[in-house]
């Protein structure tokens, strides 16, 4: 049984009903409908912390999805799960792939910056200041891109950029 049919939450049920109605009345291809169903089920599983199931649904959603904008969000969510699982290299790969299709995803730039900042902090703890500086510089570049897209957001990142004299 598809995940969308077993949600117990009223809001989830309502959203599922509305989404199903929209899928029936808006002209879409069977591939688009299939991709959306997998994407919706992936989001539901992800919100419940069922990351393996969410990944499976997202990977399935990428097969029929051809729209670059919609595909970017699928790839972004795959990146989120890899980040949550501590698989930072994989996460960065999926954020890059999402940004290739949709360069206006400030949250992807932010998440990439957070990973780079984390790796910089790890390098500091390991006593490698040169590597730490390189990771921090990369984090700064990603945060600058996120801030450029949404200037009122990422206040902590803006403060970090100012404190570290990386803000231009």
From Swiss-Prot:
GO terms for biological process: photosynthesis. Keywords: Chloroplast, Membrane, Photosynthesis, Plastid, Repeat, Thylakoid, TPR repeat. InterPro entries: PSI_Ycf3_assembly, TPR-like_helical_dom_sf, TPR_rpt, Ycf3/AcsC/BcsC/TPR_MFPF. It is a peripheral membrane protein. One of its GO terms (cellular component) is chloroplast thylakoid membrane. This is Photosystem I assembly protein Ycf3. Pfam families: TPR_1 (PF00515). Essential for the assembly of the photosystem I (PSI) complex. May act as a chaperone-like factor to guide the assembly of the PSI subunits.
């Amino acid at each position: 049984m598809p995940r969308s049919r077993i949600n117990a939450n009223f809001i989830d049920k309502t959203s599922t009903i509305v989404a199903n109605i929209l899928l029936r009345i808006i002209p879409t291809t069977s591939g688009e409908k299939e991709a959306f169903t997998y994407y919706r089920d992936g989001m539901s599983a992800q919100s419940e912390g069922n990351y393996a199931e969410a990944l499976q649904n997202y990977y399935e959603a990428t097969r029929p999805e051809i729209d670059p904008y919609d595909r970017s969000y699928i790839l972004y969510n795959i990146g989120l799960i890899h980040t949550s699982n501590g698989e930072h290299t994989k996460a960065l790969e999926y954020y890059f792939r999402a940004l290739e299709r949709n360069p206006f995803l400030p949250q992807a730039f932010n998440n990439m910056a957070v990973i780079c900042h984390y790796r910089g902090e790890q390098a500091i703890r390991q006593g490698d200041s040169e590597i730490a500086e390189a990771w921090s510089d990369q984090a700064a570049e990603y945060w600058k891109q996120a801030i450029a897209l949404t200037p009122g957001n990422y206040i902590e990142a803006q403060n970090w950029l100012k404190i570290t004299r990386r803000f231009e």
